């Protein structure tokens, strides 16, 4: 089966699941009653335009939510984590905000343009990248002193409303950032800081071993209409882990900040897994922990009252670092602005009621789960397409898989490796065979010589895998 047919089926079966694309004319109407500045705007900002700002993102990224700077001042070393501030361009009483409430998240169909949560104009104004709106951008910044010996945060962490200057030269891909570790002091110091942050988290949770996992993913060659499995280099992985640790540090600080300054209400990201984690053996690998998380149904959720996120090791945790693509983070930003402004504007209204916060948490849980399921289907489709490309190129293909559960009707399988590549691919077969006892979590290998394009069900997509189980039930 050729790629043209796969791509045609993707356009028919997968892309529509993400929903309707943004309409330029409708976005113009949304912007008409978006009057800014509005109630929660911050006019008095700390000027950090003299600092070198770095952003590290995937190739082709337009919606850069986060950046950082590391610098010395008064013989002290500082880490500043800068988060884009789209809410400064959004009136909370506008039709635009209602549209964002409905969208909840940005959707990312593979090898396609994103379906942004907000109109392009707002996205580009907020994005911490040089674009048609210039190189001076607004940010909410987490500032901490760093110990020059241990590279751990010390002293009081500060929350600042800032303006920063971004640079095209410092907008790096993970690959280019990784290549500059040895030559760029800021990048190398950032890596040292992130490793110290990870070591501190390892004292609180076994979840840090998830950082070990490197999942291969399809990489597209649109010029030649093909794809292949790609594994990040060691330096690319280290850059992704660095940015992740900065985000966890910022989200944990903001979670604590909201608990203290907003009476424990807000929009928190939680995962109640402490008791379960205590049952996991101490030397477990990242891949084995991920398998156990899947089998045991461990999941993170949004709630409107404070509670721990045990997988990241934080007693309070929120989503603050991706406001261009997540409603939850925008809500968090408005709450931070309210806390900042209420000391000088005594009659300032709280932006959201408790009922609204509860609704937001429910909407975020529902939409996040829905989009994650769509992304699983998307990834599955593209990996099957990539296996097809490998077979067309006469490559040998061996998969490793294991059974996660059997419900009495559906057999749930995870494909965890394709040749040397670690992947995560769910595969479900309908089998009415209560007599067979399936070995759960036992990894087995299977050579594959053909695949078919995914249709409504998984069965028939990998015939040789089907035959391992379906022939037994005949």
Segments predicted by a language model, with ranges:
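Electropositive polyanion-binding surfaces
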Residues: 2-4, 10, 31-436, 444-447, ...
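Compositionally biased low-complexity segments enriched in polar/charged residues
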Residues: 449-451, 474
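Boundary/activation segment at the start of structured domains
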Residues: 1-30
């Amino acid at each position: 089966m050729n790629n043209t047919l796969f791509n045609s089926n993707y356009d028919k079966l997968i892309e529509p699941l993400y929903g309707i694309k943004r309409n330029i004319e409708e976005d113009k109407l949304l912007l008409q009653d978006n009057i800014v500045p509005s109630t929660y705007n911050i006019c008095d900002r700390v000027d950090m335009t003299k600092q070198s700002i770095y952003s590290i993102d995937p190739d082709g990224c337009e919606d850069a939510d986060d950046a950082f700077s590391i610098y010395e001042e008064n013989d002290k070393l500082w880490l500043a984590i800068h988060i884009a501030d789209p809410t400064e361009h959004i009136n909370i009483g506008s039709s635009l905000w209602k549209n964002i409430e409905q969208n909840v998240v940005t959707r990312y169909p593979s090898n396609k343009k994103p379906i942004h949560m907000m109109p392009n104009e707002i996205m580009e104004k907020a994005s911490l990248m040089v674009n048609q709106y210039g190189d001076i951008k607004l940010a909410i910044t987490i500032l901490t002193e760093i110990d020059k010996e241990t590279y751990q945060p010390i002293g009081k962490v500060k929350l600042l409303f800032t303006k920063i200057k971004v640079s095209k030269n410092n907008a790096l891909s993970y690959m280019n950032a990784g290549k500059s570790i040895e030559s760029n002091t800021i990048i190398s110091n950032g890596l040292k800081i992130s490793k110290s942050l990870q070591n501190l988290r390892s004292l609180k949770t076994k979840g840090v071993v998830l950082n070990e996992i490197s999942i291969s993913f399809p990489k597209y060659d649109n010029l030649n209409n093909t794809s292949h499995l790609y594994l990040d280099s060691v330096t690319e992985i280290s850059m992704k882990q660095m940015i992740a640790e900065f985000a966890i540090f910022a989200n944990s600080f903001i979670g604590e900040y909201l608990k203290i300054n907003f009476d424990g209400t807000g929009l928190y990201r939680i995962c109640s897994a402490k008791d379960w984690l205590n049952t996991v053996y101490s030397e477990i690998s990242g891949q084995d922990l991920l398998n156990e998380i899947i089998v045991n149904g461990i999941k993170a959720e949004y709630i409107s009252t404070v509670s721990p996120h045990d997988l990241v090791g934080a007693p309070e945790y929120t989503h603050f670092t991706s406001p261009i693509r997540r409603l939850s983070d925008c809500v968090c930003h408005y709450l931070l602005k309210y806390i900042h402004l209420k000391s000088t504007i005594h009659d300032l209204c709280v932006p959201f009621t408790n009922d609204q916060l509860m609704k937001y948490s429910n909407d975020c849980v529902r939409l996040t789960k829905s989009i994650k399921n769509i992304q699983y289907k998307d990834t599955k489709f593209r990996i099957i397409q990539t296996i097809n490309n490998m077979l067309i190129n006469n490559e040998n293909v061996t998969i490793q898989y294991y059974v996660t559960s059997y419900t009495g009707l559906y057999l749930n399988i995870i494909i965890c490796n394709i040749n040397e590549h670690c992947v995560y691919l769910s595969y479900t077969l309908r089998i009415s065979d209560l007599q067979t006892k399936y070995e759960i979590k036992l990894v087995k290998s299977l050579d594959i010589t053909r695949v078919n394009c995914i249709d409504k069900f998984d069965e028939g997509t990998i015939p040789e895998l089907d035959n391992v189980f379906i022939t037994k039930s005949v």
